[in-house]
From Swiss-Prot:
It is found in: Mitochondrion. It comes from the Eukaryota. Keywords: Mitochondrion, Ribonucleoprotein, Ribosomal protein. The gene is mrpl57. This is Large ribosomal subunit protein mL63. It holds the Pfam family MRP-63. GO terms for cellular component: mitochondrial ribosome; ribonucleoprotein complex. Belongs to the mitochondrion-specific ribosomal protein mL63 family. PANTHER family: LARGE RIBOSOMAL SUBUNIT PROTEIN ML63, MITOCHONDRIAL RIBOSOMAL PROTEIN 63. GO terms for molecular function: structural constituent of ribosome.
Length: 103
């Protein structure tokens, strides 16, 4: 009975792969290859980021025209959704049938 309780108890407390006293993962050749590939990609990204595509003069206001065009598109879409104006004069115009200026 005591042996059964001892064998069916929970395992080692905590998680074996996380924490301060975790079990270290074995370093395989695939892990090394992936790390090297990632570092090479990062070095290439740093290379291209370090060289600007445009000068500061070219960069200043280069998207202003596109941004203005996009804002006009958004504004037109909003106005298309909005119902058109209704005036009281148009709705009550039928009441003016017999109204004339005194002559």
């Amino acid at each position: 009975m005591f042996l059964t309780l001892a064998l069916l108890r929970k395992g080692i407390p905590g998680k074996q792969w996380i924490g301060k006293y975790r079990r270290p993962r074995p370093v395989t050749w695939q892990i090394k290859r992936n790390v090297i590939k990632r570092l090479e990609q990062e070095a290439e990204n740093e290379y291209w980021i370090s060289r600007p595509f445009m000068t500061l003069e070219q960069e200043r206001g280069h998207a202003a025209q596109r941004r203005e065009w996009m804002w006009q598109q958004i504004k037109a879409e909003r106005q298309a959704k909005f119902p058109e104006h209704k005036y009281i004069a148009d709705q009550l115009n039928h009441l003016r049938v017999t109204k004339t200026w005194p002559s």
